[in-house]
A protein has these predicted regions:
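Short, well-ordered beta-to-alpha junction loops that form the rim of enzyme active sites
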Residues: 56, 175-176
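Conserved ANL (AMP-binding/adenylate-forming) active-site segment centered on the GW(Y/F)…HTG consensus within
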Residues: 146-150
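Transmembrane beta-barrel strands of outer-membrane/channel proteins
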Residues: 130-136, 173-175
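Repeated loop/turn-to-beta-strand initiation elements of outer-membrane beta-barrel proteins
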Residues: 168-169
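Periplasmic N-terminal accessory/gating domains of Gram-negative outer-membrane beta-barrel systems
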Residues: 1-121, 139-143, 153-162
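Short helix-loop capping/hinge motifs at secondary-structure junctions, enriched
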Residues: 123-125
Length: 176
């Protein structure tokens, strides 16, 4: 018989590159893409975003990049990531795979969700782009009738990928 290469050890979801490209986001934060799944609750704003899975504390999540842990080991950041900003550029993501409390012994050290950011890889075609995003106080609503403090946040970067040896060896680089 035919055997599938896809395995699952519990409930989960996959956010594809197309989903990422079509989702409106002010700061290109991971929370903006994860909230497409109703099992997540996103609290806070911009740098203090807290991602809760299935009602658990945000620190119970495990965040990985291509399977390598990228958590906050000291518990200093409210978001649970190793950095205050996004730990990886959204432009480098091929997909975001989420597993909610899987029963596999190969996935552990968390009780909420395993959020795995899968990066893009190079192909036989040389492709790349430069990008930039900025935001300031003009993007903030005037809900309480209070003046908003001035601020500015700019993000600039590039991604490029292609072949080193056609059909055998590829590269992909991103900088932000």
């Amino acid at each position: 018989g035919v055997r599938s290469g896809i395995s699952s050890s519990g409930p989960g979801s996959t956010i594809t590159a197309d989903d990422i490209a079509l989702t409106a986001s002010i700061d290109k934060g991971l929370g903006d893409f994860l909230k497409r799944d109703s099992r997540f609750s996103i609290q806070g704003t911009f740098r203090d975003v807290q991602i809760s899975a299935l009602g658990s504390n945000n620190r119970y999540n495990n965040f990985t990049i291509d399977g390598v842990a990228a958590n906050d080991p000291l518990g200093l950041n409210a978001n649970g990531f190793a950095s205050v900003r996004n730990p990886i550029s959204v432009e480098t993501l091929a997909q975001i795979r989420v597993d909610f409390a899987p029963y596999s012994v190969t996935k552990g050290n968390f009780g909420g969700a395993n959020i795995n950011a899968v990066t893009k890889s190079g192909t036989n075609e040389l492709k790349g782009k430069f990008y930039g995003y900025d935001t300031d106080q003009t993007n903030v609503g005037d809900v309480l009738g209070e003046p908003v403090s001035q601020f500015s946040d700019e993000t600039k970067g590039f991604v490029v990928g292609g072949p080193i040896i056609e059909d055998k060896l590829f590269f992909f680089v991103g900088y932000e």
